């Protein structure tokens, strides 16, 4: 007689989900402060993270988040593109403030900035990528929760959740689990009940996917109801014989009256030039006739002053 299958607990279901999302895969390097969370090392050098400790750290982080009265005092930040959608979804369901993208230096330390804020808790995706907000949070005594891989630096990190923080499925799964735990502790979701929000909403999506789907659709050619392509079209023009002469076309030059030519002036020549008052004879027989020199103007005559002789 086969024994009935035992129903999995909530922790076992979460661990199976994290296995499917490859949360347990680390890197080939291991920080000395992350050795306590490593389960084993594979033959190819990849460190395997203990998902049991990951689940416990998620519970600890959820308790810290629930302990803050105003959710707007919590900042969830991710500079990594794979975590930006998950950060926005986490803030949507938990009420926290999300910062998706590059961190503006001085957000937590420079009071002259318009984006200055003093949060009570900071949640990050990667301590290596988000190193600037971690340093500023340390200067402002802000507790920090971060998802740490096996090679992540643990400096200034108060609660490090060991997990794969480089995969888009891993990051989405972690934020989904953390959001569900927070809602369960707030009694928004009844304990033991399934959350109706799918984990796929927290996954990163490629922005080119909708464009590719639109390009695959074949646009049908419009049907104008023409069945006989040899039929007469365009107001009587032959559809099949385009080279035939068109006899019915109006003659555009028939209605235009002929213009009589302008009569030439008798005895005139194009090369003739007007007579110039000059003593130098100028040849005016052809097209290469030279231009007339300027006319000399006599100097004014002043009484009592002799005219210039030209040597002055």
Curated annotation (Swiss-Prot):
This is Small ribosomal subunit protein uS2. Disulfide bonds: none annotated. GO terms for cellular component: cytosolic small ribosomal subunit. Component of the small ribosomal subunit. Mature ribosomes consist of a small (40S) and a large (60S) subunit. The 40S subunit contains about 33 different proteins and 1 molecule of RNA (18S). The 60S subunit contains about 49 different proteins and 3 molecules of RNA (25S, 5.8S and 5S). Interacts with ribosomal protein S21. Keywords: Cytoplasm, Ribonucleoprotein, Ribosomal protein. The keyword NAD does not apply. Belongs to the universal ribosomal protein uS2 family. One of its GO terms (biological process) is translation. One of its GO terms (molecular function) is structural constituent of ribosome. It is found in: Cytoplasm. Required for the assembly and/or stability of the 40S ribosomal subunit. Required for the processing of the 20S rRNA-precursor to mature 18S rRNA in a late step of the maturation of 40S ribosomal subunits. Gene3D superfamilies: Glucose-6-phosphate isomerase like protein, domain 1 (3.40.50.10490). It holds the Pfam family Ribosomal_S2.
């Amino acid at each position: 007689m086969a024994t009935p299958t035992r129903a999995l607990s909530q922790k076992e279901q979460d661990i199976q989900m994290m296995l499917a999302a490859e949360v347990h895969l680390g890197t080939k390097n291991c920080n000395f402060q992350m050795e306590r969370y490593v389960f084993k090392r594979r033959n190819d050098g990849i460190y395997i993270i203990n998902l049991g400790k990951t689940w416990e750290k998620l519970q600890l982080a959820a308790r810290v988040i629930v302990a803050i009265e105003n959710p707007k005092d919590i900042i969830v930040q991710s500079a990594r593109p794979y975590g930006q959608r998950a950060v926005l979804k986490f803030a949507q369901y938990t009420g926290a403030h999300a910062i998706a993208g590059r961190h503006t230096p001085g957000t937590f330390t420079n009071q002259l900035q318009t984006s200055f804020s003093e949060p009570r808790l900071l949640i990050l995706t990667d301590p290596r990528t988000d190193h600037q907000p971690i340093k500023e949070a340390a200067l402002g005594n802000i507790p920090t929760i971060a998802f740490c891989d096996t090679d992540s630096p643990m400096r200034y990190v108060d609660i490090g959740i060991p997990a794969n923080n480089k995969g888009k499925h891993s990051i989405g799964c972690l934020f989904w689990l953390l959001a569900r735990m927070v809602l369960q502790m707030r009694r928004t979701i009844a304990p033991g009940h399934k959350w109706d929000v799918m984990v796929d909403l927290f996954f990163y999506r490629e922005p080119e996917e909708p464009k590719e789907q639109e390009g695959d659709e074949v646009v049908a050619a419009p049907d104008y109801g023409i069945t006989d392509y040899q039929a007469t079209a365009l107001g009587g023009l032959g559809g099949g014989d385009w080279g035939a002469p068109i006899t019915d076309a109006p003659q555009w030059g028939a209605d235009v009256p002929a213009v009589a030519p302008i009569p030439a002036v008798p005895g005139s020549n194009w090369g003739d030039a007007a007579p110039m008052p000059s003593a130098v004879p100028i040849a005016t027989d052809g097209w290469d006739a030279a231009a007339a020199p300027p006319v000399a103007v006599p100097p004014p005559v002043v009484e009592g002053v002799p005219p210039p002789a030209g040597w002055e």
